[in-house]
UniProtKB/Swiss-Prot annotation:
Reaction equations catalysed: Strict requirement for an Asp residue at positions P1 and P4. It has a preferred cleavage sequence of Asp-Xaa-Xaa-Asp-|- with a hydrophobic amino-acid residue at P2 and a hydrophilic amino-acid residue at P3, although Val or Ala are also accepted at this position
Residue numbers carrying Phosphoserine: S26
Family that this chain belongs to: Belongs to the peptidase C14A family.
Claim: Transferase is one of the keywords in the record: no
GN (gene name): CASP3
Main location: cytoplasm
Protein name as catalogued: Caspase-3
Top-level class of the enzyme under EC nomenclature: hydrolase
Amino acid sequence: MENNKTSVDSKSIKTLETKILHGSKSMDSGISLDVSYKMDYPEMGLCIIINNKNFDKNTGMACRSGTDVDAANLRETFTNLKYEVRNKNDLTREEILELMHSVSKEDHSKRSSFICVLLSHGEEGKIFGTNGPVDLKKLTSFFRGDCCRTLTGKPKLFIIQACRGTELDCGIETDSGTEDDMACQKIPVEADFLYAYSTAPGYYSWRNSKDGSWFIQSLCAALKQYVHKLELMHILTRVNRKVAVEFESFSTDSTFHAKKQIPCIVSMLTKELYFYH
């Protein structure tokens, strides 16, 4: 157990008829042959790391000590996975939105996927620039299928290390497809996104001033260990387990002492994702 110092469906819509569209590639068993994302494009893709450590005084938000450790660890991890990593530090909310808009307008046609890591203060549905909050929905909307066509049908991963509220978890003891196919398919604009949150809705997310955040430490370790063996959702389940079991806060303030954390994965992926091919 880690003991280092830690910081802290719609009732108004009438029933509509639906139709089932059967895929063109299938087996007699009904299982689709095209179950995993194509990851053998010429490039793996971009990995944008936004690392906000220092904040304007008038925001009242503290310096995020230990976040540089996370940023360095993430850069090494995704560079080893052949991503083009771009680190950005201490961005305002306007700069974050400008960056995301700019990246979404790039040509991703030769890229397999897209990753964005957000390291900052936060609250439910928001991430903080150095001068104030940004709605996550607005930030990620630039990459929807109808906005960023060269990433349509490709996995878009958002990794978010930030608080989602002020609740504290005290814990409890326990016993124990082809390109031709894609051209004729219509998919939801919100498809193929995955959000990996460091903590559950409403809760604090813990960070160690020396070793970095519990979530990013665990994520990087799991990727290094399992990336050539397991599918992404299986890897993230290992991350959940590691954070839940191996970490606990240590503080001289009893309010914040012996607290736990569980990451939260929200997936709209439509296929399995293997980083190897």
